[in-house]
Amino acid sequence: MANYFNTLNLRQQLAQLGKCRFMQRAEFADGCDVLKGKKVVIVGCGAQGLNQGLNMRDSGLDISYTLRKAAITEKRASWQKATDNGFAVGTYEELIPTADLVLNLTPDKQHSDVVKTVMPLMKQGAALGYSHGFNVVEEGQQIRADITVVMVAPKCPGTEVREEYKRGFGVPTLLAVHPENDPKGVGMAIAKAWASATGGDRAGVLESSFVAEVKSDLMGEQTILCGMLQAGSLLCYDKLVAEGTDPAYAGKLIQFGWETITEALKQGGISLMMDRLSNPAKLRAFELSEQLRTLMRPLFEKHMDDIIAGEFSRGMMADWAEDDAKLFGWREETGKSAFENALAFAGKIAEQEYFDNGVVMVAMVKAGVELAFETMVASGIYEESAYYESLHELPLIANTVARKRLYEMNVVISDTAEYGNYLFANAAVPLLREHFMPTLKAGDLGASKAEGQNVDNLALLAANEATRNHPIEKIGQVLRGYMKDMKRIAVGG
Protein backbone atom coordinates (compact mmCIF):
# COMPACT_ATOMS: atom_id res chain seq x y z
CA MET A 1 0.00 0.00 0.00
CA ALA A 2 1.23 3.49 -0.87
CA ASN A 3 1.12 6.44 1.53
CA TYR A 4 -2.19 8.13 0.60
CA PHE A 5 -0.96 11.67 1.26
CA ASN A 6 2.02 11.18 -1.03
CA THR A 7 -0.26 10.13 -3.90
CA LEU A 8 -1.97 13.54 -3.87
CA ASN A 9 -0.75 16.49 -5.90
CA LEU A 10 0.35 19.65 -4.09
CA ARG A 11 -3.02 21.39 -4.46
CA GLN A 12 -4.83 18.38 -3.04
CA GLN A 13 -2.35 18.07 -0.19
CA LEU A 14 -2.78 21.72 0.78
CA ALA A 15 -6.56 21.49 0.52
CA GLN A 16 -6.71 18.52 2.86
CA LEU A 17 -4.14 19.90 5.31
CA GLY A 18 -6.14 23.12 5.49
CA LYS A 19 -9.58 21.57 5.92
CA CYS A 20 -10.89 22.92 9.19
CA ARG A 21 -14.26 24.39 10.11
CA PHE A 22 -15.73 24.93 13.54
CA MET A 23 -19.22 23.47 13.31
CA GLN A 24 -22.23 25.30 14.69
CA ARG A 25 -24.31 23.76 17.46
CA ALA A 26 -27.39 23.92 15.24
CA GLU A 27 -25.77 21.42 12.86
CA PHE A 28 -26.23 18.78 15.55
CA ALA A 29 -29.90 19.47 16.19
CA ASP A 30 -30.82 15.91 15.17
CA GLY A 31 -28.36 14.41 17.62
CA CYS A 32 -27.60 10.79 16.79
CA ASP A 33 -30.97 10.03 15.16
CA VAL A 34 -29.30 8.91 11.92
CA LEU A 35 -27.80 5.93 13.75
CA LYS A 36 -30.82 4.98 15.87
CA GLY A 37 -32.18 1.61 14.83
CA LYS A 38 -28.86 0.78 13.17
CA LYS A 39 -26.37 -1.81 14.35
CA VAL A 40 -23.04 -0.36 15.48
CA VAL A 41 -20.28 -2.93 15.99
CA ILE A 42 -17.03 -1.85 17.66
CA VAL A 43 -13.79 -3.72 16.96
CA GLY A 44 -11.59 -3.53 20.04
CA CYS A 45 -12.41 -2.76 23.65
CA GLY A 46 -9.55 -0.56 24.81
CA ALA A 47 -9.88 2.88 26.40
CA GLN A 48 -11.48 4.59 23.38
CA GLY A 49 -13.46 1.53 22.31
CA LEU A 50 -15.07 0.89 25.69
CA ASN A 51 -15.75 4.48 26.68
CA GLN A 52 -17.10 5.58 23.31
CA GLY A 53 -19.31 2.50 23.33
CA LEU A 54 -20.68 3.30 26.79
CA ASN A 55 -21.52 6.84 25.71
CA MET A 56 -23.14 5.71 22.48
CA ARG A 57 -25.27 3.13 24.28
CA ASP A 58 -26.38 5.74 26.79
CA SER A 59 -27.34 7.92 23.82
CA GLY A 60 -29.75 5.23 22.64
CA LEU A 61 -27.69 3.36 20.07
CA ASP A 62 -27.41 -0.41 19.53
CA ILE A 63 -23.79 -1.21 20.42
CA SER A 64 -21.98 -4.55 20.41
CA TYR A 65 -18.33 -5.61 20.36
CA THR A 66 -16.53 -7.97 18.05
CA LEU A 67 -13.28 -9.59 19.09
CA ARG A 68 -10.96 -12.24 17.72
CA LYS A 69 -12.13 -15.75 18.50
CA ALA A 70 -9.12 -16.38 20.75
CA ALA A 71 -9.91 -13.28 22.85
CA ILE A 72 -13.40 -14.64 23.46
CA THR A 73 -12.53 -18.28 24.16
CA GLU A 74 -9.66 -17.30 26.43
CA LYS A 75 -11.76 -14.59 28.10
CA ARG A 76 -9.07 -11.96 27.71
CA ALA A 77 -9.24 -8.44 29.18
CA SER A 78 -11.12 -7.01 26.18
CA TRP A 79 -13.81 -9.69 26.47
CA GLN A 80 -13.99 -9.19 30.23
CA LYS A 81 -14.46 -5.41 29.93
CA ALA A 82 -17.18 -5.71 27.30
CA THR A 83 -19.14 -8.41 29.10
CA ASP A 84 -18.74 -6.79 32.53
CA ASN A 85 -20.42 -3.71 31.08
CA GLY A 86 -23.32 -5.71 29.67
CA PHE A 87 -22.46 -5.59 25.98
CA ALA A 88 -23.10 -8.38 23.49
CA VAL A 89 -19.81 -9.84 22.25
CA GLY A 90 -19.25 -11.98 19.18
CA THR A 91 -16.67 -13.04 16.63
CA TYR A 92 -16.04 -11.13 13.42
CA GLU A 93 -18.00 -13.71 11.46
CA GLU A 94 -20.98 -13.43 13.80
CA LEU A 95 -21.33 -9.65 14.07
CA ILE A 96 -19.63 -7.84 11.17
CA PRO A 97 -22.17 -8.99 8.51
CA THR A 98 -25.00 -7.48 10.60
CA ALA A 99 -23.33 -4.09 11.12
CA ASP A 100 -24.45 -0.84 9.54
CA LEU A 101 -21.43 0.90 11.07
CA VAL A 102 -18.18 -0.84 12.02
CA LEU A 103 -15.88 1.19 14.29
CA ASN A 104 -12.23 0.16 14.13
CA LEU A 105 -10.97 1.34 17.53
CA THR A 106 -7.98 -0.98 17.81
CA PRO A 107 -4.35 0.26 18.13
CA ASP A 108 -2.81 1.71 14.95
CA LYS A 109 -0.52 -1.26 14.50
CA GLN A 110 -3.53 -3.59 14.19
CA HIS A 111 -5.58 -1.46 11.80
CA SER A 112 -4.36 -2.96 8.55
CA ASP A 113 -4.97 -6.56 9.62
CA VAL A 114 -8.34 -5.67 11.15
CA VAL A 115 -9.59 -3.91 8.02
CA LYS A 116 -8.40 -6.69 5.72
CA THR A 117 -10.26 -9.18 7.92
CA VAL A 118 -13.54 -7.32 8.40
CA MET A 119 -13.93 -5.75 4.95
CA PRO A 120 -14.95 -8.99 3.17
CA LEU A 121 -17.53 -9.58 5.91
CA MET A 122 -19.11 -6.11 5.73
CA LYS A 123 -22.45 -5.85 3.97
CA GLN A 124 -22.93 -3.76 0.86
CA GLY A 125 -23.17 -0.05 1.63
CA ALA A 126 -22.06 -0.28 5.26
CA ALA A 127 -19.83 2.34 6.91
CA LEU A 128 -16.40 2.02 8.50
CA GLY A 129 -15.26 4.39 11.25
CA TYR A 130 -11.90 5.35 12.74
CA SER A 131 -10.82 7.59 15.62
CA HIS A 132 -7.36 8.11 14.10
CA GLY A 133 -6.61 8.15 10.39
CA PHE A 134 -3.12 6.65 10.35
CA ASN A 135 -4.23 3.50 8.52
CA VAL A 136 -5.90 5.49 5.75
CA VAL A 137 -3.34 8.28 5.37
CA GLU A 138 0.03 6.75 6.20
CA GLU A 139 -0.54 3.11 5.29
CA GLY A 140 -2.76 4.00 2.33
CA GLN A 141 -5.42 1.42 3.18
CA GLN A 142 -7.64 0.74 0.17
CA ILE A 143 -11.27 0.31 1.20
CA ARG A 144 -14.07 -1.20 -0.87
CA ALA A 145 -15.76 1.42 -3.04
CA ASP A 146 -19.27 0.85 -1.64
CA ILE A 147 -18.16 1.46 1.97
CA THR A 148 -18.47 4.92 3.53
CA VAL A 149 -15.39 5.83 5.59
CA VAL A 150 -15.64 8.38 8.42
CA MET A 151 -13.65 9.50 11.42
CA VAL A 152 -14.61 10.86 14.84
CA ALA A 153 -11.55 11.72 16.92
CA PRO A 154 -12.14 12.89 20.52
CA LYS A 155 -9.28 15.13 21.65
CA CYS A 156 -8.95 13.41 25.03
CA PRO A 157 -8.05 10.00 26.43
CA GLY A 158 -10.94 7.54 26.51
CA THR A 159 -11.47 7.87 30.26
CA GLU A 160 -12.12 11.61 29.90
CA VAL A 161 -14.53 10.96 27.01
CA ARG A 162 -16.63 8.95 29.44
CA GLU A 163 -16.30 11.18 32.50
CA GLU A 164 -17.27 14.34 30.62
CA TYR A 165 -20.27 12.59 29.09
CA LYS A 166 -21.45 11.38 32.51
CA ARG A 167 -21.50 14.94 33.81
CA GLY A 168 -23.60 16.07 30.85
CA PHE A 169 -20.82 17.55 28.77
CA GLY A 170 -18.30 16.16 26.29
CA VAL A 171 -14.81 16.63 24.89
CA PRO A 172 -13.75 18.62 21.81
CA THR A 173 -13.82 16.38 18.76
CA LEU A 174 -12.63 16.29 15.15
CA LEU A 175 -14.73 14.60 12.49
CA ALA A 176 -13.98 13.84 8.85
CA VAL A 177 -15.20 11.95 5.81
CA HIS A 178 -12.64 10.22 3.58
CA PRO A 179 -13.12 11.84 0.15
CA GLU A 180 -12.31 8.57 -1.64
CA ASN A 181 -15.09 6.69 0.20
CA ASP A 182 -18.39 8.54 0.38
CA PRO A 183 -20.34 6.81 -2.41
CA LYS A 184 -23.82 7.80 -1.21
CA GLY A 185 -22.93 11.20 0.24
CA VAL A 186 -24.03 10.16 3.73
CA GLY A 187 -20.62 10.27 5.42
CA MET A 188 -21.12 13.63 7.10
CA ALA A 189 -24.50 12.63 8.53
CA ILE A 190 -23.01 9.44 9.97
CA ALA A 191 -19.99 11.24 11.43
CA LYS A 192 -22.16 13.93 13.02
CA ALA A 193 -24.42 11.32 14.61
CA TRP A 194 -21.43 9.39 15.95
CA ALA A 195 -19.87 12.57 17.38
CA SER A 196 -23.17 13.54 19.00
CA ALA A 197 -23.59 10.08 20.51
CA THR A 198 -20.21 10.38 22.26
CA GLY A 199 -21.08 13.88 23.56
CA GLY A 200 -18.57 15.70 21.38
CA ASP A 201 -21.11 18.20 20.03
CA ARG A 202 -21.54 19.64 23.53
CA ALA A 203 -17.90 20.79 23.68
CA GLY A 204 -17.25 21.80 20.07
CA VAL A 205 -16.61 19.88 16.86
CA LEU A 206 -14.16 20.67 14.07
CA GLU A 207 -14.91 19.42 10.57
CA SER A 208 -11.48 18.30 9.42
CA SER A 209 -9.92 15.77 7.05
CA PHE A 210 -8.18 12.46 7.60
CA VAL A 211 -4.95 14.10 6.42
CA ALA A 212 -5.15 17.14 8.72
CA GLU A 213 -6.03 15.00 11.73
CA VAL A 214 -3.17 12.58 11.20
CA LYS A 215 -0.43 15.09 10.42
CA SER A 216 -1.36 17.44 13.28
CA ASP A 217 -1.93 14.61 15.75
CA LEU A 218 1.48 13.08 15.04
CA MET A 219 3.20 16.45 15.36
CA GLY A 220 1.55 17.37 18.64
CA GLU A 221 2.14 14.07 20.39
CA GLN A 222 5.76 13.77 19.28
CA THR A 223 6.78 17.25 20.38
CA ILE A 224 4.98 19.23 23.07
CA LEU A 225 2.46 16.67 24.29
CA CYS A 226 4.77 13.75 25.06
CA GLY A 227 8.30 14.35 23.82
CA MET A 228 8.75 17.66 25.63
CA LEU A 229 7.30 16.29 28.88
CA GLN A 230 9.63 13.30 28.70
CA ALA A 231 12.72 15.35 27.88
CA GLY A 232 11.87 18.04 30.43
CA SER A 233 11.23 15.52 33.19
CA LEU A 234 14.54 13.72 32.70
CA LEU A 235 16.57 16.93 32.37
CA CYS A 236 15.00 18.85 35.24
CA TYR A 237 15.20 15.93 37.65
CA ASP A 238 18.86 15.31 36.90
CA LYS A 239 19.64 19.03 37.26
CA LEU A 240 17.91 19.29 40.64
CA VAL A 241 19.63 16.24 42.08
CA ALA A 242 23.04 17.30 40.75
CA GLU A 243 22.66 20.59 42.61
CA GLY A 244 21.84 18.92 45.91
CA THR A 245 18.04 18.77 45.97
CA ASP A 246 16.51 15.83 47.84
CA PRO A 247 15.80 13.27 45.07
CA ALA A 248 12.37 12.48 46.49
CA TYR A 249 11.40 16.17 46.51
CA ALA A 250 12.78 16.60 42.99
CA GLY A 251 10.74 13.64 41.80
CA LYS A 252 7.53 15.04 43.21
CA LEU A 253 8.19 18.56 41.96
CA ILE A 254 8.58 17.26 38.41
CA GLN A 255 5.90 14.56 38.55
CA PHE A 256 3.14 16.87 39.75
CA GLY A 257 4.62 20.13 38.48
CA TRP A 258 3.65 19.60 34.83
CA GLU A 259 0.07 18.92 35.83
CA THR A 260 -0.22 21.94 38.15
CA ILE A 261 1.39 24.30 35.66
CA THR A 262 -0.72 23.14 32.72
CA GLU A 263 -3.94 23.36 34.73
CA ALA A 264 -3.48 27.13 34.50
CA LEU A 265 -2.75 26.69 30.81
CA LYS A 266 -6.07 24.90 30.34
CA GLN A 267 -8.06 27.57 32.14
CA GLY A 268 -6.50 30.68 30.63
CA GLY A 269 -3.84 29.81 28.09
CA ILE A 270 -0.17 30.72 28.21
CA SER A 271 -1.03 34.16 29.60
CA LEU A 272 -2.62 32.79 32.77
CA MET A 273 0.19 30.28 33.22
CA MET A 274 2.75 33.10 33.06
CA ASP A 275 0.65 35.26 35.38
CA ARG A 276 1.07 32.66 38.13
CA LEU A 277 4.72 33.72 38.39
CA SER A 278 6.06 36.78 40.18
CA ASN A 279 7.03 39.59 37.83
CA PRO A 280 10.79 38.87 38.07
CA ALA A 281 10.14 35.16 37.50
CA LYS A 282 7.82 35.92 34.59
CA LEU A 283 10.52 37.94 32.87
CA ARG A 284 13.01 35.15 33.45
CA ALA A 285 10.60 32.50 32.12
CA PHE A 286 10.00 34.63 29.03
CA GLU A 287 13.74 34.99 28.48
CA LEU A 288 14.29 31.24 28.88
CA SER A 289 11.40 30.42 26.56
CA GLU A 290 12.84 32.65 23.84
CA GLN A 291 16.16 30.87 24.24
CA LEU A 292 14.41 27.50 23.93
CA ARG A 293 12.42 28.61 20.89
CA THR A 294 15.59 29.51 19.02
CA LEU A 295 17.43 26.36 20.07
CA MET A 296 14.62 23.90 19.42
CA ARG A 297 12.93 25.29 16.31
CA PRO A 298 15.05 23.15 13.91
CA LEU A 299 14.11 20.00 15.84
CA PHE A 300 10.40 20.83 15.75
CA GLU A 301 10.64 21.57 12.03
CA LYS A 302 12.47 18.30 11.37
CA HIS A 303 9.70 16.33 13.04
CA MET A 304 7.04 18.17 11.04
CA ASP A 305 8.97 17.66 7.79
CA ASP A 306 9.39 13.94 8.48
CA ILE A 307 5.69 13.61 9.30
CA ILE A 308 4.59 15.44 6.14
CA ALA A 309 6.96 13.44 3.93
CA GLY A 310 5.98 10.10 5.47
CA GLU A 311 9.49 9.43 6.78
CA PHE A 312 8.29 9.06 10.36
CA SER A 313 5.66 6.50 9.38
CA ARG A 314 8.11 4.52 7.28
CA GLY A 315 10.55 4.29 10.17
CA MET A 316 7.91 3.28 12.68
CA MET A 317 6.35 0.66 10.41
CA ALA A 318 9.83 -0.77 9.83
CA ASP A 319 10.08 -1.17 13.61
CA TRP A 320 6.68 -2.90 13.60
CA ALA A 321 8.22 -5.43 11.21
CA GLU A 322 11.02 -5.97 13.74
CA ASP A 323 8.53 -6.68 16.55
CA ASP A 324 8.92 -3.16 17.97
CA ALA A 325 12.57 -3.70 18.84
CA LYS A 326 13.38 0.02 19.00
CA LEU A 327 10.17 0.89 20.85
CA PHE A 328 10.71 -1.72 23.53
CA GLY A 329 14.37 -0.78 23.90
CA TRP A 330 13.53 2.89 24.41
CA ARG A 331 10.75 1.97 26.83
CA GLU A 332 13.21 -0.09 28.89
CA GLU A 333 15.72 2.79 28.96
CA THR A 334 13.04 5.16 30.22
CA GLY A 335 12.06 2.70 32.94
CA LYS A 336 15.64 2.65 34.21
CA SER A 337 15.98 6.45 34.40
CA ALA A 338 16.67 8.12 37.74
CA PHE A 339 13.44 10.12 37.57
CA GLU A 340 11.30 7.03 37.10
CA ASN A 341 12.93 5.35 40.08
CA ALA A 342 12.97 8.27 42.52
CA LEU A 343 11.47 7.51 45.92
CA ALA A 344 8.13 9.04 46.84
CA PHE A 345 8.22 12.33 48.76
CA ALA A 346 6.07 12.26 51.89
CA GLY A 347 5.81 16.01 52.33
CA LYS A 348 3.29 18.44 50.86
CA ILE A 349 4.14 20.82 48.04
CA ALA A 350 1.83 23.84 47.88
CA GLU A 351 0.34 24.70 44.51
CA GLN A 352 2.21 27.99 44.16
CA GLU A 353 5.47 26.25 45.03
CA TYR A 354 5.28 24.30 41.78
CA PHE A 355 5.34 27.59 39.87
CA ASP A 356 7.89 29.33 42.10
CA ASN A 357 10.33 26.40 41.97
CA GLY A 358 9.59 25.44 38.37
CA VAL A 359 10.27 28.60 36.38
CA VAL A 360 12.18 26.69 33.71
CA MET A 361 9.33 24.17 33.45
CA VAL A 362 6.95 27.04 32.69
CA ALA A 363 9.41 28.23 30.05
CA MET A 364 9.55 24.76 28.51
CA VAL A 365 5.77 24.59 28.30
CA LYS A 366 5.50 28.05 26.77
CA ALA A 367 8.21 27.44 24.18
CA GLY A 368 6.97 23.95 23.32
CA VAL A 369 3.34 24.94 22.86
CA GLU A 370 4.21 27.95 20.72
CA LEU A 371 6.71 26.05 18.58
CA ALA A 372 4.36 23.13 17.94
CA PHE A 373 1.53 25.51 17.02
CA GLU A 374 3.69 27.68 14.76
CA THR A 375 5.27 24.71 13.00
CA MET A 376 1.90 23.12 12.26
CA VAL A 377 0.39 26.37 10.97
CA ALA A 378 3.43 27.01 8.76
CA SER A 379 2.83 23.58 7.20
CA GLY A 380 -0.73 24.41 6.17
CA ILE A 381 -2.65 23.14 9.20
CA TYR A 382 -5.31 25.56 10.42
CA GLU A 383 -4.99 27.29 13.78
CA GLU A 384 -7.98 25.51 15.33
CA SER A 385 -6.51 22.08 14.62
CA ALA A 386 -3.06 23.19 15.76
CA TYR A 387 -4.50 24.49 19.05
CA TYR A 388 -6.25 21.22 19.87
CA GLU A 389 -3.13 19.20 19.05
CA SER A 390 -0.84 21.34 21.22
CA LEU A 391 -2.16 23.48 24.06
CA HIS A 392 -5.52 21.78 24.62
CA GLU A 393 -4.26 18.23 25.06
CA LEU A 394 -1.20 19.08 27.16
CA PRO A 395 -2.96 19.17 30.58
CA LEU A 396 -4.48 15.77 29.83
CA ILE A 397 -1.10 14.20 29.10
CA ALA A 398 0.50 15.97 32.09
CA ASN A 399 -2.20 14.36 34.22
CA THR A 400 -0.91 10.91 33.22
CA VAL A 401 2.61 11.85 34.34
CA ALA A 402 1.15 12.85 37.71
CA ARG A 403 -0.36 9.40 38.10
CA LYS A 404 2.68 7.17 37.58
CA ARG A 405 5.35 9.37 36.00
CA LEU A 406 6.52 8.65 32.44
CA TYR A 407 5.48 5.00 32.64
CA GLU A 408 1.81 5.96 32.86
CA MET A 409 2.09 8.50 30.06
CA ASN A 410 3.62 5.95 27.73
CA VAL A 411 1.04 3.31 28.66
CA VAL A 412 -1.93 5.61 28.06
CA ILE A 413 -0.82 7.16 24.77
CA SER A 414 -0.92 5.14 21.56
CA ASP A 415 1.97 3.02 20.31
CA THR A 416 2.38 5.58 17.53
CA ALA A 417 2.63 8.44 20.03
CA GLU A 418 5.08 6.52 22.21
CA TYR A 419 7.42 5.81 19.30
CA GLY A 420 7.38 9.46 18.22
CA ASN A 421 7.87 10.62 21.80
CA TYR A 422 11.10 8.64 22.09
CA LEU A 423 12.38 9.93 18.75
CA PHE A 424 11.90 13.53 19.89
CA ALA A 425 13.14 13.08 23.46
CA ASN A 426 16.22 11.16 22.34
CA ALA A 427 17.24 14.18 20.26
CA ALA A 428 16.03 16.90 22.65
CA VAL A 429 17.73 15.61 25.82
CA PRO A 430 21.35 15.81 24.56
CA LEU A 431 20.63 19.09 22.75
CA LEU A 432 19.27 20.79 25.86
CA ARG A 433 21.72 19.14 28.23
CA GLU A 434 24.63 20.64 26.30
CA HIS A 435 23.28 24.00 25.17
CA PHE A 436 20.51 25.00 27.60
CA MET A 437 20.66 23.44 31.06
CA PRO A 438 24.16 24.86 31.83
CA THR A 439 22.77 28.39 31.29
CA LEU A 440 20.25 28.11 34.14
CA LYS A 441 20.70 30.44 37.10
CA ALA A 442 19.70 30.37 40.75
CA GLY A 443 15.92 30.63 40.97
CA ASP A 444 15.20 28.96 37.61
CA LEU A 445 14.64 25.49 39.07
CA GLY A 446 14.26 24.40 42.68
CA ALA A 447 14.17 26.31 45.93
CA SER A 448 17.29 28.43 45.38
CA LYS A 449 16.55 32.15 45.28
CA ALA A 450 17.14 34.31 42.25
CA GLU A 451 19.66 37.10 42.48
CA GLY A 452 18.03 40.51 42.26
CA GLN A 453 14.32 41.21 42.08
CA ASN A 454 14.30 44.42 40.06
CA VAL A 455 11.77 44.63 37.23
CA ASP A 456 12.08 46.77 34.13
CA ASN A 457 8.55 48.01 33.45
CA LEU A 458 9.06 48.23 29.70
CA ALA A 459 10.56 44.76 29.54
CA LEU A 460 7.61 43.37 31.51
CA LEU A 461 5.15 45.19 29.24
CA ALA A 462 6.85 43.81 26.14
CA ALA A 463 6.87 40.26 27.52
CA ASN A 464 3.18 40.45 28.44
CA GLU A 465 2.21 41.82 25.03
CA ALA A 466 4.27 39.23 23.16
CA THR A 467 2.66 36.42 25.13
CA ARG A 468 -0.91 37.68 24.87
CA ASN A 469 -0.70 38.56 21.19
CA HIS A 470 0.60 35.19 20.06
CA PRO A 471 -1.90 33.62 17.61
CA ILE A 472 -2.44 30.59 19.85
CA GLU A 473 -3.70 32.87 22.61
CA LYS A 474 -6.23 34.51 20.31
CA ILE A 475 -7.68 31.31 18.87
CA GLY A 476 -7.52 29.78 22.33
CA GLN A 477 -9.85 32.41 23.77
CA VAL A 478 -12.47 31.48 21.18
CA LEU A 479 -12.16 27.71 21.54
CA ARG A 480 -11.99 27.72 25.34
CA GLY A 481 -15.35 29.43 25.36
CA TYR A 482 -16.85 26.13 24.24
CA MET A 483 -15.04 24.23 26.97
CA LYS A 484 -15.67 26.46 29.97
CA ASP A 485 -17.68 23.75 31.69
CA MET A 486 -14.91 21.17 31.59
CA LYS A 487 -13.99 20.04 35.08
CA ARG A 488 -10.60 20.27 36.73
CA ILE A 489 -8.72 17.07 35.98
CA ALA A 490 -5.88 17.36 38.50
CA VAL A 491 -5.24 14.30 40.65
CA GLY A 492 -3.39 16.45 43.15
CA GLY A 493 0.07 16.35 44.63
Swiss-Prot record:
Q: Which InterPro entries match?
A: 6-PGluconate_DH-like_C_sf, 6PGD_dom2, KARI, KARI_C, KARI_N, NAD(P)-bd_dom_sf
Q: Which GO terms describe its cellular component?
A: cytosol
Q: What is its EC number?
A: 1.1.1.86
Give GO MF terms, alphabetically: ketol-acid reductoisomerase activity; magnesium ion binding
Q: Which residues form the KARI C-terminal knotted domain?
A: 209-344, 345-486
Question: What UniProt keywords are attached to this protein's entry?
Answer: Amino-acid biosynthesis, Branched-chain amino acid biosynthesis, Magnesium, Metal-binding, NADP, Oxidoreductase, Repeat
> Which residues does the record give as NADP(+) binding sites?
C45, G46, A47, Q48, R68, R76, S78, D108, K109, Q110, G158
Instruction: Using the record's annotation, list all stretches that form the KARI N-terminal Rossmann domain.
Output: 15-208
Which top-level group of life is the source organism from?
Bacteria
**Catalysed reactions, as listed in the record:** (2R)-2,3-dihydroxy-3-methylbutanoate + NADP(+) = (2S)-2-acetolactate + NADPH + H(+); (2R,3R)-2,3-dihydroxy-3-methylpentanoate + NADP(+) = (S)-2-ethyl-2-hydroxy-3-oxobutanoate + NADPH + H(+)
Where does this protein act, in terms of pathway? Answer: Amino-acid biosynthesis; L-isoleucine biosynthesis; L-isoleucine from 2-oxobutanoate: step 2/4; Amino-acid biosynthesis; L-valine biosynthesis; L-valine from pyruvate: step 2/4
Q: Where, in this chain's numbering, is substrate bound? A: S414
Q: What class of enzyme is it?
A: oxidoreductase
Q: Where does Mg(2+) 2 bind?
A: D217, E389, E393
To which protein family does this belong? Belongs to the ketol-acid reductoisomerase family.
Matching entries from PANTHER family are given as: KETOL-ACID REDUCTOISOMERASE, MITOCHONDRIAL
Report the protein name in the record.
Ketol-acid reductoisomerase (NADP(+))
Q: Which organism is it from?
A: Aeromonas salmonicida (strain A449)
